[in-house]
């Protein structure tokens, strides 16, 4: 059975791909769930339009990610003042991805989602400079030096 995917399906293809599947898989799984439509001339044209739109969006997303990367790199080291537990340099609590996003925004950077921030460990628990990776796009990553300093 020849189908055109209307959603990404693991181990099968992406939106707009024309795939050949067994009849039962197509009739009993893909079609009822709206994951695919039967391939026809009109459906093929629609799939081509979807594919073109997806490619345009991918290029736009990559350009947008590169703009964010340039803006973040222009910031230089980002300073984050935190409360310390004493003179030992240990923090009262820890620095999370949300704290990093807030520090980048406060430094004049773009508004980011905390889920794209990759800390060197689960949480930062000491003063000093820590490299923090920001995953903007599958092809674009940027490393931000984060200076954790005691709050005055």
Curated annotation (Swiss-Prot):
Gene Ontology CC terms, in alphabetical order: ribonucleoprotein complex; ribosome
Domain of life: Bacteria
Keyword Transcription regulation: no
PROSITE patterns listed in its UniProt record: RIBOSOMAL_L9 (PS00651)
Keyword Coiled coil: no
GO molecular function annotations of the record: rRNA binding; structural constituent of ribosome
Disulfide cross-links: none
Keywords: Ribonucleoprotein, Ribosomal protein, RNA-binding, rRNA-binding
Signal peptide: none
Gene Ontology biological process terms from the UniProt entry: translation
Record function comment: Binds to the 23S rRNA.
Family according to the record: Belongs to the bacterial ribosomal protein bL9 family.
PANTHER family in UniProt: 50S RIBOSOMAL PROTEIN L9
Protein name: Large ribosomal subunit protein bL9
């Amino acid at each position: 059975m020849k189908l055109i995917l209307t959603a990404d399906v693991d181990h099968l293809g992406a939106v707009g791909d024309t795939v050949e599947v067994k009849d039962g898989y197509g009739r009993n799984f893909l079609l009822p769930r709206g994951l695919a439509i039967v391939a026809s001339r009109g459906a093929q044209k629609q799939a081509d339009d979807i594919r073109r739109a997806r490619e345009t969006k991918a290029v736009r997303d990559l350009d947008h990610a590169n703009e964010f990367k340039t803006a973040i790199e222009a910031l230089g080291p980002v300073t984050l003042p935190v409360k310390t537990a004493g003179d030992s340099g240990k923090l009262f609590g820890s620095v999370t991805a949300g704290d990093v996003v807030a520090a980048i925004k406060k430094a004049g950077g773009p508004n980011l989602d905390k889920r794209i921030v990759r800390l060197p460990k689960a949480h930062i628990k000491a003063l000093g400079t820590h490299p923090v990776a920001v995953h903007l796009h599958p092809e674009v990553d940027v490393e931000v030096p984060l200076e954790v300093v005691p709050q005055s």
